[in-house]
C-alpha cells in the first residue's frame, strides 16, 4: 500500500518554513511546545471571524514574537490597535514571557490559502450547502486567483447516508512527490446533523525554486544592462 506523507512536512527547509522558530533544552522543550499549542488554539478560537491562516511563533530568550496571518486583520487589530494591546496582555500571561509582541499581517489572496479554503467549505457544509457545490466553487475561485492546481476532499457521512465515504474533485496539476513544488495543505472539520465531516485541501502554486532562478537571472540581466 502507498504511504502518505504530510505535504508541508515533506517540504520543510526547501519550499516551506517552520511555524515555530526556537531552540530549547530537553527540560523546557515540552513546556514551550504546549505553550505554542495554547497560543494557536486561543488565537484561532478568539478570532474565528478573522480568518486566521497561520500563527508563527519566534522565541529568543525572554522575548516572544507572534505573527498572525489573517484574511480580515482589522478584527484582530481592533479600533486604534486596542484589540492587539489586549491580546498582548493575555498572551503574556499564557507564555510567562517578559516581552511579547504581536504583529498582524493580511493574507492578500485567501482563495490560495488551503486552510482558509478548507474552513470556508466546512462553514458551507454546516449551513447545509451541497458538498459538491461548495467544493466546485472553491476550485473555481482558486483557479481564477492564479492556482496551478487544486484538490478538495470531503469525507464522512456525506448527505446523511449510513455509510461514510470520501469524495474529491481536482483541477490542474498536483505534483505531490515533487519537493520543489509549492503546495499548500489545509484541513477543517464541519459539525453537521449526521456527524463530523472532514475537509482536506491541497493547492499547487507553481515551482518555487524555478521562480527563484528566474529572479536571479533577471537581476543578472539588469546588472549587465547597467554596465
UniProtKB/Swiss-Prot annotation:
It holds the Pfam family Ribosomal_S3_C. GO terms for biological process: translation. InterPro entries: KH_dom (IPR004087), KH_dom-like_a/b (IPR015946), KH_dom_type_2 (IPR004044), KH_sf_prok-type (IPR009019), Ribosomal_S3_C_sf (IPR036419), Ribosomal_uS3_bac-typ (IPR005704), Ribosomal_uS3_C (IPR001351), Ribosomal_uS3_CS (IPR018280). Keywords: Ribonucleoprotein, Ribosomal protein, RNA-binding, rRNA-binding. Coiled coil: none annotated. It comes from the Bacteria. GO terms for molecular function: mRNA binding; rRNA binding; structural constituent of ribosome. Residues 39-108 form the KH type-2 domain. One of its GO terms (cellular component) is cytosolic small ribosomal subunit. Belongs to the universal ribosomal protein uS3 family. Binds the lower part of the 30S subunit head. Binds mRNA in the 70S ribosome, positioning it for translation. Part of the 30S ribosomal subunit. Forms a tight complex with proteins S10 and S14. This is Small ribosomal subunit protein uS3. It comes from Persephonella marina (strain DSM 14350 / EX-H1). The lineage of its organism: Bacteria, Pseudomonadati, Aquificota, Aquificia, Aquificales. The gene is rpsC.
Amino acid at each position: 500500500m502507498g504511504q502518505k506523507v504530510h505535504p508541508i512536512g515533506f517540504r520543510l527547509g526547501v519550499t516551506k518554513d517552520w511555524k515555530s522558530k526556537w531552540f530549547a533544552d530537553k527540560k523546557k522543550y515540552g513546556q514551550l511546545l504546549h505553550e505554542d499549542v495554547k497560543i494557536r488554539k486561543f488565537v484561532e478560537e478568539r478570532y474565528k471571524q478573522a480568518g486566521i491562516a497561520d500563527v508563527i511563533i519566534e522565541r529568543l530568550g525572554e522575548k516572544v514574537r507572534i505573527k498572525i496571518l489573517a484574511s480580515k486583520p482589522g478584527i484582530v487589530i481592533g479600533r486604534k490597535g486596542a484589540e492587539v494591546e489586549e491580546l498582548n496582555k493575555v498572551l503574556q500571561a499564557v507564555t510567562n514571557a517578559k516581552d511579547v509582541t504581536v504583529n498582524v499581517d493580511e493574507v492578500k489572496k485567501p482563495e490560495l490559502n488551503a486552510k482558509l479554503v478548507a474552513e470556508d467549505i466546512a462553514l458551507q457544509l454546516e449551513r447545509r450547502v451541497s458538498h459538491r457545490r461548495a467544493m466546485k466553487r472553491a476550485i473555481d475561485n482558486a483557479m481564477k486567483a492564479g492556482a496551478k492546481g487544486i484538490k478538495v476532499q470531503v469525507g464522512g457521512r456525506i448527505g446523511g447516508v449510513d455509510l461514510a465515504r470520501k469524495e474529491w474533485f481536482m483541477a490542474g496539476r498536483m505534483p505531490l512527490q515533487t519537493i520543489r513544488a509549492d503546495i499548500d495543505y489545509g484541513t477543517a472539520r464541519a459539525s453537521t446533523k449526521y456527524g463530523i465531516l472532514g475537509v482536506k485541501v491541497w493547492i499547487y502554486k507553481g515551482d518555487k525554486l524555478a521562480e527563484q532562478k528566474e529572479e536571479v537571472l533577471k537581476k543578472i540581466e539588469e546588472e549587465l544592462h547597467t554596465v
